[in-house]
Curated annotation (Swiss-Prot):
The gene is rpsF. GO terms for molecular function: small ribosomal subunit rRNA binding; structural constituent of ribosome. This is Small ribosomal subunit protein bS6. It comes from the Bacteria. The keyword Ribosomal protein applies. Binds together with bS18 to 16S ribosomal RNA. InterPro entries: Ribosomal_bS6, Ribosomal_bS6_sf, Ribosomal_S6_plastid/chlpt, Transl_elong_EF1B/ribsomal_bS6. The keyword RNA-binding applies. Coiled coil: none annotated. It comes from Desulfitobacterium hafniense (strain Y51). SUPFAM superfamilies: Ribosomal protein S6. Signal peptide: none annotated.
Amino acid sequence: MKAYEVLYVIRPDLDDEAVAATVDKLSEVVTNNGGADVAIDKWGKRRLAYEVNDYREGFYILMNFNGEARTAQEVERIMKISDAVVRFLTTKKED
């Protein structure tokens, strides 16, 4: 299994419960698709470098996990169709 790192930004107008639900849902997607060792680091609400979808701020979440390529692809697919996620970046960590 490879190590992946996903940094994603959640809409700032969501309440804390909705943010937590989104984080839990994405962690569950990883574990349901063969991923393991999910680590979540919440960076909190920060200002974006530029306006994205009319938002100037967002909740930054860093998620690290081990999994196959299909696991990372499924997480990206879910984030693309999610209304809560404004932006995301997935990188494969070097060994």
